[in-house]
Design a protein with these regions (language model features):
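Non-catalytic C-terminal accessory modules of carbohydrate-active enzymes
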Residues: 112-278
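Active-site core of glycosidic bond-cleaving carbohydrate-active enzymes
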Residues: 1-178, 232
Length: 278
């Protein structure tokens, strides 16, 4: 790792790796204290936040650290390939003339990081990663992005769907289906800049739903859900501690409590509520 960093001309990484080596060599063989460390800062160290298994406090610190390993197009695959300006660039980038995975920024680790940010309640940061990826949208293939940003590797990559669909559908709009039970749980977690947005014709089993979100200047949120099958249950979780705060404008709704949170169990082809975030 030291040789790689030195060859690439990354003095910050060389210094960090040498400190890590000294710490390891000084440690006593009888000392069983856990001392986790990383060498290459590979993006896979962020998967505990992607899967949601990291403790919130540790996750917060790890997410802050990960933001330093970015360029205008997303997250570096191998963190020691970045330079001292990484995490600060917003409008400039100079790529290599010959393709190499060394120094690569890819849509997979960037999408993973967006999902991780959403898992810990940071939709604005998640949107930032999506916007970085979208800078290479349609560079070569209309409607698609390269495997490696901005224009290297495979020109079509399946994991791009994961990198965008999970943050937008499952996390921003909060759609969490359980088709076998004919239930769809919805709890939006929108970026602050998204005051009005819609996601239409999402097919779930033999049902199809559309979700419309609107936030007014006073912070009131109007959420409208349309579905083809009115006998399916829509479980809305507006995040209000007071169960009387969500106002049901359309549809049938029953207020219930699950795991200490209030849930509106709704039915009908059109459901509409208003509420304010805590």
């Amino acid at each position: 790792a030291v040789v790689r960093a030195d060859t690439l001309g990354k003095p910050w990484a060389v210094a960090e790796l040498k400190r890590t080596r000294e710490t390891i060599l000084k440690a006593s063989a009888q000392d069983t204290t856990l001392r986790p460390f990383v060498l290459h800062h590979n993006w896979v160290v962020n998967t505990p936040m992607e899967t949601g298994i990291a403790d919130p406090d540790k996750a917060r610190r790890a997410l802050e650290t990960a933001r330093k390993f970015t360029n205008p197009f997303g997250v570096f695959v191998t963190g020691i390939d970045r330079d001292e300006t990484a995490g600060q660039q917003e409008g400039s980038f100079e790529g290599s003339k010959v393709f190499s995975y060394t120094g690569a920024v890819m849509t997979l680790p960037t999408g993973v990081q967006a999902i991780a940010e959403n898992n810990y309640g940071n939709p604005d940061q998640a949107l930032g990663y999506l916007l970085r990826m979208s800078r290479s949208f349609s560079y070569a293939h209309p409607g698609s992005m390269y495997e490696v940003s901005p224009d290297y590797g495979m020109l079509v990559q399946a994991w791009n769907v994961y990198s965008f669909a999970v943050p937008v559908v499952h996390q921003f709009f909060g759609i969490d289906p359980m088709a076998a039970r004919k239930e769809i749980r919805i709890r939006p977690q929108m970026p602050a800049s998204w005051n009005q947005c819609s996601l239409e014709n999402v097919r779930i089993g033999d049902n199809q739903i559309s979700v419309h979100y609107e936030k007014t200047e006073d912070g009131t949120i109007k959420l409208t859900v349309l579905q083809d099958r009115g006998d399916w249950q829509i479980l809305l979780q507006p995040g209000a501690e007071d169960p009387s705060l969500p106002k049901v404008l359309k549809g049938d709704a029953e207020r219930t409590q699950e795991d200490g949170q209030w849930v509106l169990r709704c039915s009908g082809e059109q459901i509409q509520i208003t509420y304010n975030l805590n």
